[in-house]
From Swiss-Prot:
Its EC number is 2.7.12.2. This is Serine/threonine-protein kinase STE7 homolog. Residues 57-69, 127-136, 144-162 have a biased composition (Polar residues). Disulfide bonds: none annotated. Residues 1-18 have a biased composition (Basic and acidic residues). The modification Phosphoserine is found at residue 402. It catalyses: L-seryl-[protein] + ATP = O-phospho-L-seryl-[protein] + ADP + H(+); L-threonyl-[protein] + ATP = O-phospho-L-threonyl-[protein] + ADP + H(+); L-tyrosyl-[protein] + ATP = O-phospho-L-tyrosyl-[protein] + ADP + H(+).
Length: 589
C-alpha cells in the first residue's frame, strides 16, 4: 500500500499544472464534504462551486442522510401543471331540455342568474368555482334553468370533431327557458309580495323579414307585422344560419338589367356563398312599401325544392328593394332556349320541367295560399344539376307588379289567362294556363302568338318565323305594313315577341280572349319534320282550356301518372336529363 501511494505521488509530480491526487489517507483524515468536493474537482478554478446550504438538514456528524436526499422533489407548480386534467365543456344538447337528461347542472339557489366556470387554483389542485352573474330584476327573484359550464379553454385538448363555437355558446346562453323563468318569478312574487318589483322589458331585434317558421294555427296571409326600424335602411332578413349585411355582399358580375331593376351575381363574404341580388325600384308610398315588406316575410317562409330559396331583403332609402336569393348558374329558361339543340327543349326535359312547375305551384297554394301570377320562361331558373325552380312570385299585385317592372307589360301579358285579362276572378288555374303557353314556346322554339290565324305560307311569313326562331330583331320592311301584318313585327326583347304600340297591345289581348287556345296537336315540328309527342300535346291542351271552371288545378294534373308524367317520379329520365343539363352548363361557360 505504501509503495502504491508513493508511485501515484511521483506520477502526479510530473504534471506540475495539476494538484496531486489525494490519497485515501488524506480523505479519511478530512471528512468535510466541502473538502471532499474540492479534492474531487482537483482544485480547478473553472469548476463551479456547489453550495450545500440549501440542501436538506445535515446530521450532526456533517454527512447527508439518505432520507433527506429522497425528499428533494421538483417544484409544486410543475407537478400541478402535469397533473391538470383536460378542460371539459358541458353544454346541453338541443333535445336535452325535452327528451334526454340535461348535461348541465340546474342551479336554483342563486339570487341572480349565473353561469359557473370551473378553474383550478394556481397554487393547489383544488378546483375553484367562479361565477359570472347577470343583473336580475329587483326583489332577488331566484333563477332556474341555467347551465353550469366548465370552460378551462385549451385548443390543444378540444376534440376537433366536437368543437363548440363561441356563437353556439352565446346561443345557449340567450336561448334560456323563459317559460320556466317566468313561472318561478311569478311564484316567487306571490310568496314575497311585500318585496318591490320592477317590470323589465325584454329587448328584441326585429329584422325586415321574420325568420320564424309558420305555424298551422296562423294563416301565412296574415302574419304578425312588427314596426320597421326608423333608419335610412331596413335591415336585411336573417335566417338561423345566415346573416346578411350590405357591407358583406361583393358584386361579381351583372346578370341583367332593365328600366326599373337589375340582377347581379354576388358573394357573401363571411360564408363564401354565391347569391343572386335583385334591385327593384318601387313606389315611394309608405303603404306599398309596407305591403311589400309584409309579403317578403311570407316568401321567406317558403321552403321547397321547386321554389327558389329566399335569403333576405332590405328596403333602401332611395325607394329600392334589395332581394337576395339563391343563385342558379344555368340561368332562366329564356336564356337556355337558344343554347338547346335545334333551339328546342327535348320532350324528356319538358316532362321534368312540367312536373317541377306544377309541384311548385301546388306547394305555394296549398301551404301558403300564394298564386304566382307571372309564370313565363324568365321566371323559371335551372341549376347545373337540372333542377327547375320558380322565382319572382308574390302575394299581392303590388309586389307582382314591382318584380315585373324590369320586363315590358306585353311580355307579361302574353302569358296571361283570358279570365285575368277580362278582369274576372282568377286563381291558381291562371298559372296553369301560363304553363301551357310556356311549354308550347319551349317545345317549338317559337313564341305562342307569333303565327297568323290565316296561316299564310308566303315568303314573308317564313322570313318572320325564321327571325323569331333565331331570337334576332325583325327585318325592316320597306313601305307601310298593312294593319293585318302589324302584329307580325318582332323584337328580340327578352326572348319573346312584342307588339309595337298600344294598338299592338290591344290586338294581343283581343286574340287571347277571342281566339281559340293555341295547340300543338296535329302539327309538325318545323325542325325535325316529325309530329310532336302525343302525350305532350294532350297535356298542353289540358292546360289551355279557356273555361277556367273546366281547367284542372296543378295537383289534379299531377295525378296523371300513366301518360305524360309516367316514369318521372321513378327517375326514368334522370340520367338523360342530368347529361343534358351538363351540356347546357358548358355552353353557358
Amino acid at each position: 500500500m505504501t509503495r502504491t501511494t508513493r508511485i501515484d505521488t511521483q506520477e502526479a509530480t510530473k504534471h506540475k499544472d495539476l494538484p496531486p491526487v489525494p490519497s485515501p489517507l488524506s480523505l479519511s483524515s478530512n471528512p468535510n464534504p466541502e473538502c471532499l468536493m474540492e479534492s474531487k474537482s482537483l482544485g480547478r478554478k473553472n469548476f463551479k462551486k456547489l453550495s450545500l446550504d440549501a440542501s436538506p438538514v445535515k446530521s450532526t456528524s456533517g454527512s447527508l442522510r439518505s432520507s433527506d436526499m429522497m425528499s428533494i422533489k421538483e417544484p409544486t407548480s410543475l407537478r400541478q401543471k402535469r397533473q391538470r386534467p383536460p378542460p371539459i365543456l358541458h353544454l346541453p344538447t338541443a333535445s336535452s331540455s325535452a327528451t334526454s337528461t340535461p348535461t348541465s347542472n340546474i342551479t336554483g339557489s342563486s339570487s341572480a342568474s349565473s353561469i359557473q366556470f370551473a378553474q383550478k387554483s394556481p397554487g393547489s389542485g383544488v378546483i375553484v368555482s367562479q361565477t359570472l352573474s347577470r343583473p336580475s330584476s329587483a326583489g332577488g327573484i331566484p333563477s332556474s334553468g341555467y347551465s353550469s359550464l366548465n370552460v378551462n379553454q385549451s385548443n390543444r385538448n378540444v376534440d376537433p370533431d366536437n368543437v363548440v363555437s363561441t356563437d353556439m355558446i352565446l346561443n345557449q346562453i340567450s336561448n334560456l327557458d323563459l317559460t320556466s323563468m317566468n313561472h318561478h318569478r311569478q311564484h316567487y312574487q306571490n310568496s314575497h309580495h311585500h318585496l318591490p318589483t320592477t317590470n323589465r322589458k325584454r329587448q328584441t331585434v326585429i329584422s325586415s323579414i321574420s325568420p320564424t317558421k309558420s305555424s298551422a294555427a296562423s294563416s301565412p296571409l296574415e302574419p304578425q307585422i312588427q314596426s320597421l326600424p326608423a333608419s335610412s335602411q331596413s335591415p336585411i332578413a336573417t335566417t338561423s344560419a345566415l346573416k346578411l349585411n350590405n357591407k358583406d355582399l361583393l358584386t361579381l358580375k351583372q346578370l341583367g338589367s332593365g328600366n326599373s331593376g337589375s340582377v347581379s351575381k354576388i358573394l357573401h363574404i363571411p360564408t363564401q356563398k354565391t347569391m343572386a341580388k335583385k334591385i327593384i325600384h318601387i313606389d315611394s308610398k309608405s303603404v306599398i312599401q309596407t305591403q311589400i315588406i309584409r309579403e317578403l316575410r311570407i316568401l321567406h317562409e317558403c321552403h321547397s325544392p321547386y321554389i327558389i330559396e329566399f335569403y333576405g331583403a332590405c328596403l333602401n332609402n332611395n325607394n329600392t328593394i334589395v332581394i337576395c336569393m339563391e343563385y342558379c348558374n344555368c340561368g332562366s329558361l329564356d336564356k337556355i332556349l337558344p343554347l338547346c339543340e335545334n333551339k328546342q327543349f327535348p320532350t324528356f326535359v319538358l316532362k321534368k320541367l312540367s312536373f317541377a312547375i306544377l309541384s311548385g305551384l301546388t306547394y305555394l297554394y296549398t301551404t301558403h295560399k300564394i298564386i304566382h301570377r307571372d309564370i313565363k320562361p324568365n321566371n323559371v331558373l335551372m341549376t347545373h344539376k337540372g333542377e327547375f325552380k320558380l322565382c319572382d312570385f308574390g302575394v299581392s299585385r303590388e309586389l307582382t307588379n314591382s318584380l315585373a317592372m324590369a320586363d315590358t307589360f306585353v311580355g307579361t301579358s302574353m302569358y296571361m289567362s283570358p279570365e285575368r285579362i277580362q278582369g274576372l276572378d282568377y286563381g291558381v288555374k291562371s298559372d296553369v294556363w301560363s304553363t301551357g303557353l310556356m311549354l308550347i314556346e319551349l317545345a317549338s322554339g317559337v313564341p305562342v302568338w307569333s303565327e297568323d290565324d290565316n296561316n299564310n305560307d308566303d315568303d314573308e311569313d317564313d322570313e318572320d318565323d325564321a327571325y323569331v326562331r333565331q331570337g334576332s330583331i325583325a327585318a325592316e320592311r320597306n313601305g307601310q305594313n298593312s294593319p293585318s301584318r302589324s302584329r307580325k313585327n318582332k323584337q328580340k326583347g327578352n326572348g319573346y315577341n312584342s307588339y309595337n304600340g298600344p294598338e299592338g297591345i290591344l290586338d294581343l289581348l283581343q286574340r287571347i280572349v277571342n281566339e281559340d287556345a293555341p295547340t300543338l296537336t296535329n302539327k309538325i315540328n318545323p325542325v325535325t319534320k316529325l309530329p310532336y309527342d302525343k302525350y305532350l300535346c294532350q297535356f298542353i291542351d289540358l292546360c289551355l282550356i279557356k273555361d277556367d271552371s273546366v281547367r284542372k288545378t296543378p295537383w289534379q294534373l299531377l295525378e296523371d301518372k300513366e301518360h305524360f308524367f309516367k316514369g318521372v317520379e321513378e327517375g326514368v329520365y334522370d340520367k338523360e336529363h342530368k347529361s343534358w343539363a351538363k351540356k347546357i352548363r358548358k355552353c353557358k361557360v
